[in-house]
Amino acid sequence: ERLYDGHKGTYGRIMHVTGCYHYRGAALLAAKAAVYAGSGLVTVWSNEKVIDSLSLFCPEATSCQRHYFDEHLLQGKDAILIGSGLGLNEDSERFVCELLSHTQVPVVIDGDALTILAKHPELLENHHSSWILTPHHGEFKRFVDFKQTSEMVDQANAFAKKYHVTLVLKGPHTLISDGNETYRIMSGNKGMSSAGMGDTLAGIISSFLGQGYLPKDAAILGTYLHGLCGDEVYKENYTVVASKVIDQIPQMMKKLNKNRSAIPFL
């Protein structure tokens, strides 16, 4: 519920380390999804091309160019999203490792940051903040070997428990586990198999994490909302694109807030 005397600081200040020259859209979609999900302030740290596009696609977000970064940029931040469209090169690998090694801010780890993390599993052993990992099945196989879907569920629970993370294992009926409890999210549809959908989900989850939700709750609510928005778009469309899903977020949140009893996990 939005507070009468609330301000942008009330609803979370989040940093997105996202996007690169070839994957500008990932940063734009994640930022807009976070803004539409209610974040008070979204700052995107990325390259010049992404930032130029951001001012048109999501003028509500602030930005910082990639050549400039110091620890002061993370001061006062309530959550970080890292990896969506970040790109894979030596600079991004070094930065991801540095940030994940030292930050005490809750983090959503998505996309290319998951690929980098899989190359440096030692980071999983010694993290200092709450982590939410958002792999699809192929990305999860870089961490854990499994052959059958039934094995995947057990492996997901064991992985989350061992490394003290919240795992959002994306796919049909996305699985979420914190190692103690496991949830299947039943919202969503086959029309959502399109580019940018994962970036949108990561942006929503980062927003809820920054607003103060516990990692498990941010993951569950974010994934459920993402699926509901996709279901709404799918009613009138053969395919579902990420930008249309984002457009549904404020209206769907309004509906959920009015009818909380309809949310199956609250």
Predicted regions located by residue number:
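Small-residue (G/A/S/T)-rich helix-start motifs and N-terminal tracts that mark the onset
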Residues: E1-P106, T115-I132, H137-L266
